[in-house]
């Protein structure tokens, strides 16, 4: 069984809709050996807004022009579907519900079928196994685990750090990924035809996201 760690970056989230500008991933084996790592740039067909809610700037991993040279989401949809729906692969993300939201809303924007896959959230795993920690952000968690951080917000690197967090929790708890998932069912999400389910909620994105289309600029 292999593991796929992925992360998504967006050019902006105007209108409540994240316009994907990159999807990065790391494919690893059960011992966390990296088999493949790639950052797939996406033309967001929307301008970049590089400010957080607190006013701090966000540094892009590449010049803006590189993103606008890339294929758009519709062109890359088959590749993303192949990655996320591959058999014999367990999918992980950090705060993965956000990435799921971005994917589904782009499916609405580009009139593509919804993805169907399962995913596990390393943020929830960290919260479950490290209840004494107050950190939720990937960078801060890496700091507490003494994982070197160089290039946050390049999608493939964030995916790599997500893998390192999962690996570190396994080491601390003297178990493997399957052991973590068995003990923490709350980290599980299923995505099927625009409906996202986890331990606490069932969320239908279908009607909610359809209303975002008019906000796309």
Question: What are the residue ranges of the model-derived segments?
Answer:
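Substrate-recognition/cap helix-loop segment adjacent to the acidic, metal-dependent catalytic center
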Residues: 99-120
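Short, amphipathic alpha-helical "lid/cap" segments that border enzyme active or binding sites
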Residues: 77, 156-159, 163
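Conserved non-catalytic scaffold segment of RNase H-like nuclease domains
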Residues: 2-105, 143
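Acidic two-metal-ion nuclease catalytic site recognized across multiple nuclease folds
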Residues: 167-217
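Short, glycine/acidic-enriched loop or turn micro-motifs at the edges of active sites
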Residues: 10-12, 124, 161
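Short, amphipathic alpha-helical segments that act as regulatory/interfacial helices
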Residues: 104, 163-170
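Active-site-proximal helix-loop-helix substrate-binding element of RNase H-like nuclease domains
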Residues: 42-60, 64-67, 122-159
């Amino acid at each position: 069984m292999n593991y796929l760690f992925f992360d998504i970056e967006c050019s902006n989230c105007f209108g409540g809709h994240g316009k994907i500008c990159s999807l990065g991933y790391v494919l690893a084996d059960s011992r966390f050996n990296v088999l493949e790592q790639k950052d797939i740039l996406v033309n967001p067909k929307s301008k970049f807004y590089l400010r957080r809610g607190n006013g701090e700037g966000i540094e892009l991993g590449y010049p803006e022009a590189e993103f606008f040279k890339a294929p758009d989401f519709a062109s890359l949809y088959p590749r993303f579907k192949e990655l996320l729906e591959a058999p014999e692969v367990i999918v992980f993300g950090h705060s993965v519900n956000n990435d799921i939201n971005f994917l589904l809303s782009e499916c609405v924007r580009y009139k593509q079928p919804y993805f169907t896959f399962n995913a596990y959230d390393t943020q929830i795993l960290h919260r479950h196994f490290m209840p004494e920690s107050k950190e939720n952000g990937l960078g801060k968690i890496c700091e507490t685990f003494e994982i070197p951080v160089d290039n946050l917000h390049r999608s493939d690197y964030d995916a790599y750090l997500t893998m390192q967090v999962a690996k570190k929790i396994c080491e601390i708890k003297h178990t493997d990924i399957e052991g973590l998932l068995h003990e923490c069912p709350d980290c599980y999400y299923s995505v099927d035809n625009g409906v996202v389910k986890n331990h606490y909620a069932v969320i239908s994105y279908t009607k909610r996201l359809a209303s975002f289309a008019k906000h796309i600029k």
